[in-house]
Amino acid sequence: MKKAVVLLSGGLDSTTCLALAKSQGFACYALSFSYGQRHSAELCAATRIAKHMGAADHKIVTLDIALFGGSALTDASIEVPEFKESPEIPVTYVPARNTIFLAMALGYAESIGARDIFIGASSVDYSHYPDCRPEFIESFQSLANLATKAGIEGDRFTINAPLQYLSKVQTIQLGAELGVDYGLTVSCYQANEAGEACGQCDSCTFRKRGFKSAGVDDPTRYQKCVHI
């Protein structure tokens, strides 16, 4: 069976990616990161999801919080803003996060003989993070095949971002078709320890709109309601 490393945050998108990779016949090696994020409830969710969905293995890598300063997701002195339509990169951007995550996933993949890496990045219904764009994914794949023994020997890596051009509605519909239990997931940037979502941040808003427009019951437990 082919192996794939799946970046699993515990959120809606990465869980859909895990389900999709499994549906394509991959033995999935889930990889999560603890980097001082205030929404640590997502790591508990990732553990539940990996077990529930039968991942071949699930590793949680702890990174030095000092690597990720200046973000509302890692710095308690910076408030997570309520949702606002804007083309600007918000304070919830974590410096080079996906680059670091993918680099570690690449090393892990090469070491276990996997040549596919799945990431739930999307450039639709997102917060304009630069490391979610298709240009970034394509460039990282090129790097992966230039920087590894496997790559230069022709055993090439593929960075799979199957949600890249899907809206949140389409992602939820896909997950529903794959039987994803979204009640296990946590997407909120500031979920409490019980995994209850704030209902006001960008991630909550995109998620809530997505379920409503997809016509799928929203299993999320919200602390507050947001009008959509």
Swiss-Prot record:
Does the keyword field hold Chloroplast? no
Enumerate the CDD domains for this protein. Answer: QueC-like
Enumerate the catalysed reactions: 7-carboxy-7-deazaguanine + NH4(+) + ATP = 7-cyano-7-deazaguanine + ADP + phosphate + H2O + H(+)
Q: Which GO biological process categories is it annotated with? A: queuosine biosynthetic process
Species of origin reads: Legionella pneumophila (strain Lens)
| Functional summary from the UniProt entry | Catalyzes the ATP-dependent conversion of 7-carboxy-7-deazaguanine (CDG) to 7-cyano-7-deazaguanine (preQ(0)).
Question: Which residues of the sequence carry a binding annotation for Zn(2+)?
Answer: 188, 198, 201, 204
Q: What is the lineage of its organism?
A: Bacteria, Pseudomonadati, Pseudomonadota, Gammaproteobacteria, Legionellales
Q: Which Pfam families match?
A: QueC
Enzyme Commission identifier(s): 6.3.4.20
Name of the featured protein: 7-cyano-7-deazaguanine synthase
Q: Give the InterPro entries listed for this entry.
A: QueC, Rossmann-like_a/b/a_fold
Q: What gene does the UniProt entry assign to this protein?
A: queC
Instruction: List positions binding ATP.
Output: 8-18
Q: Which UniProt keywords apply?
A: ATP-binding, Ligase, Metal-binding, Nucleotide-binding, Queuosine biosynthesis, Zinc
Q: Quote the cofactor binding remark.
A: Binds 1 zinc ion per subunit.
Superkingdom of origin organism: Bacteria
List, alphabetically, the Gene3D superfamilies matched. Answer: HUPs (3.40.50.620)
